[in-house]
Amino acid sequence: MTPRLRLQPESVGIGMTSQRVRDRLVERLREAGIQDEATLNAMRTVPRHLFIDEALASRAYEDTALPIGHGQTISQPWVVARMTEAVLQVTPAKVLEVGTGSGYQGAILAALGLEVYTVERIGDLLRQARKRFRHLGMNVRSKHDDGRIGWPEHGPYDAIVVTAAAPALVDALVDQLAVGGRLVAPVGGPSSQSLVQLTRGADGAIEQQVLAPVTFVPLLSGMLD
């Protein structure tokens, strides 16, 4: 897969947001075990500094989570890359993201040419993410709703990426996973979470694998404007 992205000159970045700095981040991700070249190319192409507050732009290409308001964060780049790499292994066409947040994970998936549907419970975050998608020329379908419900009208999905942690995998989301599809989600409570990969086999059987220890904000129900 080749990233498809239209960057305006002002989006390219300078200094601590320059392409050179993005390239260094990609090399750190490679050294940390990310192997999929399409994922690395998407991380190199999508300007993470556009998805955070301007005051934090100089930290955009650190391998760390950063605050985006409303008690939420933009995920650590390694985690975004690992989740993306995991779902790409099943060669998906249509992906559901639960928890749009800043829009960065959805943008990475869209840059890979995938058909992306994303759901966010916090209206203000979704409005900002939509502006970023438009600015980058990305056709990401988005919805303001309770992410735990998913978006069943457009299912089933070849891949589902959940960007907030629940104590257990949410049945309503698993039910929207296509045969041969893969769901990647953080599972656990505030003190201990694991990134879990769930794959639905051709016979409908579910196979589960733990990928890594992680720390995510909680997956909450309901909606906020």
UniProtKB/Swiss-Prot annotation:
Quote the EC number: 2.1.1.77
Q: Which organism is it from?
A: Xanthomonas euvesicatoria pv. vesicatoria (strain 85-10)
Q: Which reaction does this chain catalyze? A: [protein]-L-isoaspartate + S-adenosyl-L-methionine = [protein]-L-isoaspartate alpha-methyl ester + S-adenosyl-L-homocysteine
Entry's Gene Ontology cellular component terms: cytoplasm
Q: Which domain of life is it from?
A: Bacteria
CDD domains associated with the record: AdoMet_MTases
Q: What are its GO biological-process terms?
A: methylation; protein modification process; protein repair
Gene3D superfamilies with a match to the protein in the record: Vaccinia Virus protein VP39
Q: Which keywords fit this entry according to its UniProt record?
A: Cytoplasm, Methyltransferase, S-adenosyl-L-methionine, Transferase
Please provide, alphabetically and separated by semicolons, the GO molecular function terms listed in this UniProt record: protein-L-isoaspartate (D-aspartate) O-methyltransferase activity
Functional note: Catalyzes the methyl esterification of L-isoaspartyl residues in peptides and proteins that result from spontaneous decomposition of normal L-aspartyl and L-asparaginyl residues. It plays a role in the repair and/or degradation of damaged proteins.
| Record has Iron-sulfur as a keyword | no
Enumerate the PANTHER family for this protein. PROTEIN-L-ISOASPARTATE O-METHYLTRANSFERASE (PTHR11579), PROTEIN-L-ISOASPARTATE(D-ASPARTATE) O-METHYLTRANSFERASE (PTHR11579:SF0)
Q: Which SUPFAM superfamilies match?
A: S-adenosyl-L-methionine-dependent methyltransferases
Q: Which family does it belong to?
A: Belongs to the methyltransferase superfamily. L-isoaspartyl/D-aspartyl protein methyltransferase family.
Pfam families listed in its UniProt record: PCMT
- UniProt name for this protein: Protein-L-isoaspartate O-methyltransferase
Cellular localisation: Cytoplasm
Methyltransferase among the record's keywords?
Answer: yes
- List of catalytic residues: 75
